[in-house]
A protein has these predicted regions:
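A short core secondary-structure module
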Residues: 148, 152-198
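Glycine-rich phosphate/cofactor-binding loops in nucleotide/flavin-utilizing enzymes
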Residues: 69, 73, 94, 232-250, ...
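A structural signal for short hydrophobic beta-strand segments in well-ordered beta-sheet cores
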Residues: 140-143
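C-terminal helix-coil-helix/basic helical segment that borders enzyme active sites and/or dimer interfaces
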Residues: 22-30, 272, 276-279, 290-347
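N-terminal glycine-rich flavin-associated loop
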Residues: 87-106, 132
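Glycine-rich beta->alpha junctions and the first turn(s) of the following alpha-helix
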Residues: 195-294, 364
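A short, Trp-centered hydrophobic/proline-enriched beta-strand micro-motif
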Residues: 118-126, 170
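Amphipathic, small/basic residue-rich leader segments at the start of a protein or domain
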Residues: 1-89, 110, 114-117, 269, ...
Length: 389
């Protein structure tokens, strides 16, 4: 692995794109500008062409078939260099793994190579107005009509929806069944009649989320992933991928340990690095990050996982997203009055990136299961505590 690490580090030094000359989003959740999107798409394609996206994915479908652990080394070096994130996050973290696990041979050959190279963009169609935490109450319907399904419904919080070619979509195929049993999972095309994508502007002023209206949109029957009625099982598997992915994605503004180092550097800049309270807080963040990374290592090594493997992704999602929020809040606390300034203000420290991080962090503690719900699940299913009423 050290040879690979040296190779990747040398490649990044030669190919790091640097400053594009315009504001980049902090994550795919904020991509709402065509210039940002195309720049990030080009970066992912360059990484793929170098063999650094899909490093461990099967060669026969467009991956590179490297040994286990190779992608982790690549991702670490990208994070260390603060390289741009990979924009096709829904494809890499959820859609692709689900297709590899549950898709037909035709699905794998049709989708995998294109999603790795960012030739086709994916979004996720799970949450609905009134059906977020209680996802199984979703009301979007898929009605079988010969060799097609007709989709009607409304999805929200759809990251990359305006750019997406495909959507991993949950819809109700059997309205008479109990709510968990009547759901199916689709690899749904977005560029078809009857699909309307509308922006959702966040409190940061960025519009990376979308809502998607499905109005009698017809898609072929082979868009079904798995069996009719298997959607809840597949949705649960997707959420396990999503919660595990919360620990960090390839590239981006640096992994969590780099973020802790950034806050330490901010404390030094502000002359607060000798303050024992500040030092204690920073030490706590570093300890927490060490625990998160240790759990990530356990999750990647089956021999180290307990008899409750589903607990690890839940713990990872809960601890990493709350750590990100608390860390950004502490950085703003260090900045004092300057934390009230925003991007573009000449007096703002680090161009108000910590303020932006703090406001964006709330999405992480909600998406894929709120922190409160995750605590309930861990308490009831892992610790054996009585159910909440």
């Amino acid at each position: 692995m050290e040879a690979l690490r040296a190779e990747v580090r040398a490649w990044i030094e030669k190919n790091h794109p640097g400053d594009p000359g315009f504001k980049l989003p902090q994550s795919p959740l904020e991509v709402a500008d065509d210039r940002q999107f195309e720049w990030l798409r080009d970066w992912q394609r360059k990484l793929y062409d170098a063999g650094y996206v899909g490093a461990e994915w099967p060669r026969e479908y467009g991956g590179f078939g490297r040994e286990r652990g190779a992608q982790r080394v690549i991702d670490h070096e990208l994070g260390r260099a603060r390289a741009p994130f990979l924009v096709n996050v829904v494809a890499l973290s959820w859609a692709g793994p689900m297709i590899l696990r549950y898709g037909t041979e035709a699905h794998k050959r049709k989708f995998i190579a294109k999603l790795l190279r960012c030739d086709e963009i994916w979004c996720q169609g799970f949450s609905e107005p009134g059906s977020g935490s209680d996802l199984a109450s979703l009301r979007t319907t898929a009605v079988r009509e010969g060799d097609a399904f007709r989709i009607d419904g409304h999805k929200v919080w759809t990251t990359l929806g305006r750019y997406a070619d495909w959507c991993i979509l949950l819809a109700r195929t059997d309205p008479a069944a109990v709510k968990h049993a009547g759901i199916s999972y689709f690899l749904a095309p977005m560029k078809i009649p009857g699909v309307e994508v509308l922006p959702l502007v966040k409190m940061t002023g960025e519009g990376g989320f979308n809502q998607v209206i499905w109005n009698s949109a017809r898609m072929p029957a082979d868009a079904l992933l798995g069996r009719e009625g298997q959607g809840w099982e597949l949705a649960t598997a997707t959420l396990q991928f999503e919660r595990g992915a919360a620990e960090g994605s390839a590239g981006g503004s640096g992994g969590a340990s780099e973020q802790v180092a950034r806050v330490a550097a901010l404390a030094r800049t502000l002359g607060r690095d000798a303050d024992p309270v500040v030092r204690d807080r920073l030490a706590g963040f570093w300890i927490q990050e060490t625990a998160v990374r240790a759990n990530a290592q356990r999750a990647r090594n089956p021999g180290l996982v307990s008899d409750r493997p589903e607990a690890l992704p839940l713990m990872q999602k809960l601890t990493s997203t709350e750590q990100a929020q608390t860390l950004a809040d502490f950085a703003c606390e260090l900045e004092g009055d300057a934390a009230g300034l925003w991007i573009g203000d000449p007096a703002a420290l680090e161009n108000a990136e910590w303020q932006r991080s703090y406001m964006n962090s709330f999405a992480g503690t909600i998406a894929g299961g709120t922190s409160e719900i995750l605590r309930n699940i861990l308490g009831e299913r892992v610790l054996g505590l009585p159910k909440t009423r």
